[in-house]
Each structure stands twice: as structure tokens, then as C-alpha cells.
Amino acid sequence: MITKDPIDLFNIWYQEVLKNYSKDPTAMVLATCSKDLKPSARVVLLKQHSDEGFVFFTNMNSRKGKEISENPFVSLVFDWRQISKQVRIEGKIETLSPEDSDRYYATRSRGSQISACCSKQSNILEDKQEFITNVQKMTKEFMGKPVPRPSYWMGLRVVPMLIEFWQEGVDRIHTRYQYTRTDKHGWSIVELYP
């Protein structure tokens, strides 16, 4: 099935994977590239998606945060093998408003909030006990009080410029459709060789 708008097709596939995928279907590989052209990739979780793009949250002091600050162009991959499908997205990062980041942060578990405050993500952890002690101290300090969102922890939206849908076929005759953004609301569609 092909749709005029790739977000509509993404929604159809996403609903299919939600029904058939036992593990977290929101897991997506995020690939970034530093200013010196060294790529890196890791799994992050999709928290929202819409016509505007694909949202995740992160510590901007982490390696991925630093690379995004240097180069806002990224790729995402959803590998949904259980339904023999994959979605690949290329786009540019835009930062969510502090209010949007605050709203999502408030929905996280208290432990996740405290961990986000205490973790120096991607830095060398020389003494794990010190980290655990800091978590315990902060837990006591904020007992019965809201845990403030650290300014470096924020939401990011990948605004898609290209979305490719891949579906497995017999004898490796796979189906691939590539949508390329032509303007704010328009897309061109081509089929690619497998």
C-alpha cells in the first residue's frame, strides 16, 4: 500500500507493529555525525510523531547531543523485522520548546528524572558508587518535591526531508518507496530497486 503522505504510511505500519511486536516498537536507531565527519549511532525511543516530525528526548551533554549541536542532520531507522518492514528517515533536528520538554519530563518516573539529573551521560564513569550516592542524595533532597528538569535535558524533533519504506519480498525482490520533501507539505514519491 502506498499513500500520498509518508506520515500516513508510517502510521499504518506503526499501528501494525504495535499489534505484532513484543519488544519496544518505539526503538529507533539514531545516527549522527560529528563536525570531523565521524559517524556514530545508538538506539533511542520515539516519544511522539506527527506531520511535523519524530520526537525523542536526550541529554545534550552526551556524545549525541554534542554531535547534533555541531551537525543537525541525522538519520533514523526503525527495524521492524517481526513484520518484515523497515523505515529510514533523513532529516534535520529542531529543538522543542522548554515548555514541551518540561511537559514530557513531568511524565517520567521520579527515578528517571533523578537519574537524568545525576548522569553525566557518555562521560567516563570512574566511580559507580559515587554516581549511586549522588542519586540517593538527590532522592532525599527532593523527597515530596518536584524534580526540576536539567537545562541540558531536552526534546528534539527530526524534521524529515526523506523517508524510505522497505518491505521484504520473496527472492529478495523487496519493495522500496522513497518520499522526498518538495515543500513544507509536499512530497515526491519514487520506487527504488531493491
UniProtKB/Swiss-Prot annotation:
Superkingdom classification of source: Bacteria
Q: Cite the EC number.
A: 1.4.3.5
Q: Which UniProt keywords apply?
A: Flavoprotein, FMN, Oxidoreductase, Pyridoxine biosynthesis
Enumerate the Gene Ontology biological process terms: pyridoxine biosynthetic process
Q: Which GO terms describe its molecular function?
A: FMN binding; pyridoxamine phosphate oxidase activity
**Quaternary organization:** Homodimer.
Stored Pfam families: PNP_phzG_C, PNPOx_N
Assigned protein family: Belongs to the pyridoxamine 5'-phosphate oxidase family.
Names of required cofactors: FMN
| Name by which UniProt lists this protein | Pyridoxine/pyridoxamine 5'-phosphate oxidase
Looking up InterPro entries in the UniProt record yields: Pyridox_Oxase, Pyridox_Oxase_CS, Pyridox_Oxase_N, Pyridoxamine_oxidase_dimer_C, Split_barrel_FMN-bd
Reaction(s) catalyzed by this protein? pyridoxamine 5'-phosphate + O2 + H2O = pyridoxal 5'-phosphate + H2O2 + NH4(+); pyridoxine 5'-phosphate + O2 = pyridoxal 5'-phosphate + H2O2
Cofactor annotation comment: Binds 1 FMN per subunit.
Known role? Catalyzes the oxidation of either pyridoxine 5'-phosphate (PNP) or pyridoxamine 5'-phosphate (PMP) into pyridoxal 5'-phosphate (PLP).
Binding residues for substrate: K47, Y104, R108, S112, R172, I173, H174
**Where is FMN annotated to bind?**
42-47, 57-58, 63-64, 86, 121-122, 166, 176
What pathway does the UniProt record associate with this protein?
Cofactor metabolism; pyridoxal 5'-phosphate salvage; pyridoxal 5'-phosphate from pyridoxamine 5'-phosphate: step 1/1; Cofactor metabolism; pyridoxal 5'-phosphate salvage; pyridoxal 5'-phosphate from pyridoxine 5'-phosphate: step 1/1
